[in-house]
């Protein structure tokens, strides 16, 4: 049954999901560097599955591909970052532990709402912009923030709340079109996945570049809105 529906883009979506699942396992085992690299890998798989679907003229009348993509995204970009954040905080007080649980739950809830709304809108219109911050954004921001060497517990909690709320907001985010910027982020992400260190003191340069590009995309559209 499944082989009649699954196509190359779906395999890429499953690779996205697999990367997210492995990121969860490594985060639980407190190997956060590998976990963050796997989250970035999941984002890269997610960024190409749609492109492959268009290039292969994939027909998806039953919406099998769209559903498998959304289910993969909630694992890789909702649950994985939430568990990653919880394990990275290493709470030293009951209040901080409770705060981190609430924030992580907020990420998952807003992620599910964001993906559900996207699927509903995608069925009815061909929007030029994303409505609300795209869910892969929170994953790559958290992962690169951790790898950057600038990670801070309180900043990551505040940032997670902000991004979660922006995911379910009405702020419009344009779909990526700056090819040069995309190539730069792709190269830097590849360096991070393969753990190729390019540092100044303790600052990971590729991580900083990707992080700042994502934060710029996050905030500039809020200002414009």
Give names to the regions the model predicted.
Residues 1-11, 65-71, 123-131, 172-181:
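Short, amphipathic, aromatic/basic-enriched membrane-interface segments that mark the entry/exit
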Residues 1-47, 186, 196-225:
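Topogenic membrane-insertion module of multi-pass membrane proteins
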Residues 9-14, 55-114:
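Multi-pass membrane catalytic core of lipid/isoprenoid biosynthesis enzymes
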Residues 18, 44-52, 71, 75:
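Active-site His/Glu-centered metal-binding helix of metallohydrolases
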Residues 22-38, 81-103, 144-157, 195-205:
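Helix-coil boundary and interhelical linker segments in multi-pass alpha-helical membrane proteins
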Residues 48-65, 118-131:
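Cytosolic, membrane-interface loops and tails of multi-pass inner-membrane proteins
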Residues 127-225:
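C-terminal membrane-associated helical module and adjoining short loops/tails
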């Amino acid at each position: 049954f499944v082989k009649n529906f699954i196509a190359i883009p779906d395999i890429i979506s499953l690779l996205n999901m697999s990367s997210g699942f492995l990121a969860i396992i490594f985060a639980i085992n407190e190997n956060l560097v590998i976990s963050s690299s796997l989250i970035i890998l999941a984002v890269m798989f997610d960024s190409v599955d749609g492109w492959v679907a268009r290039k292969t003229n994939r027909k998806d009348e039953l919406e099998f591909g769209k559903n498998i993509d959304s289910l993969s995204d909630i694992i890789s970009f909702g649950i994985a970052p939430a568990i990653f954040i919880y394990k990275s905080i290493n709470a030293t007080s009951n209040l901080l532990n409770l705060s981190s649980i609430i924030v992580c739950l907020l990420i998952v809830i807003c992620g599910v709402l964001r993906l559900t709304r996207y699927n509903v809108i995608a069925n009815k219109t061909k929007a030029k912009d994303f409505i609300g911050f795209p869910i892969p954004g929170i994953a790559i921001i958290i992962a690169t923030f951790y790898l950057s060497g600038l990670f801070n517990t309180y900043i990551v909690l505040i940032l997670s709340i902000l991004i979660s709320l922006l995911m379910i907001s009405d702020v419009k985010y344009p779909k990526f079109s700056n090819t040069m910027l995309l190539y730069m982020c792709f190269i830097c992400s590849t360096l991070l996945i393969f753990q190729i260190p390019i540092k100044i003191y303790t600052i990971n340069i590729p991580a900083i570049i990707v992080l700042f590009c994502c934060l710029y995309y996050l905030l500039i559209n809020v200002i414009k809105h």
